[in-house]
């Protein structure tokens, strides 16, 4: 279940943690006078990235947190990712159809080189559920396990999920067994229903 967008509740929780607007400028400070601020780095690859950057900035500032946006080109963005030279970033993950194996992104073993647990999140409960789900052959039972894993991820927030992009796919009529899933299509399930026409004789 997504965490609701509630700037006032965010301010209340931050106040409990010692962050308050002490000088009336709309930005939270701690008892040392340090402003609550961070830099948001993103790849300036188009309109969606720019709109998302504005959304992040506006949303946080409603809770009294100052955000400086830092657009960079794709090659520089990859360098910064590798160096981990950023305060906050946006990343995009694509899902396989009909379901994705969460081990590569969310298991603690995937923190190691070669894995994609880029945020280095470790959770014994998540590991247990991932291993259980991968051993569960019955699809309905496996979906129950994945829902439990989703609840752990939603609670611990290794990522804050912002959007799901719509998708549009075209498939020729002479392909059969085309199944649509919430995450897309799986071309390996397709089969051709008619022979490919031979080229016309000269």
Write out the residue ranges for each language-model feature:
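Flexible hinge/switch segments at interdomain interfaces of large molecular machines
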Residues: 29-33, 120
């Amino acid at each position: 279940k997504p965490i609701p967008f509630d700037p006032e509740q965010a301010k209340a929780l931050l106040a409990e943690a010692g962050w308050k607007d002490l000088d009336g400028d709309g930005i939270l400070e701690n008892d040392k006078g340090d402003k609550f601020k961070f830099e948001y780095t993103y790849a300036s690859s188009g309109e969606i990235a720019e709109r998302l950057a504005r959304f992040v900035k506006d949303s946080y500032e409603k809770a009294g947190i100052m955000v400086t946006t830092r657009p960079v080109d794709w090659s520089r963005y990859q360098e910064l990712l590798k160096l981990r030279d950023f305060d906050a970033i946006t990343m995009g993950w694509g899902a396989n159809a009909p379901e994705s194996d969460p081990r590569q992104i969310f298991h603690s073993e995937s923190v190691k080189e070669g894995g994609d647990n880029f945020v280095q999140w470790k959770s014994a409960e998540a590991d247990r559920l991932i291993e259980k789900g991968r051993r569960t052959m019955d699809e309905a039972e496996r979906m129950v396990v994945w829902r439990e894993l989703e609840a752990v991820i939603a609670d611990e927030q290794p990522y804050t999920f912002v959007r799901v992009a719509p998708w549009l796919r075209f498939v020729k009529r002479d392909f059969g067994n085309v199944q649509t899933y919430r995450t897309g299509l799986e071309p390996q399930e397709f089969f051709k229903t008619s022979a490919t026409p031979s080229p016309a004789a000269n």
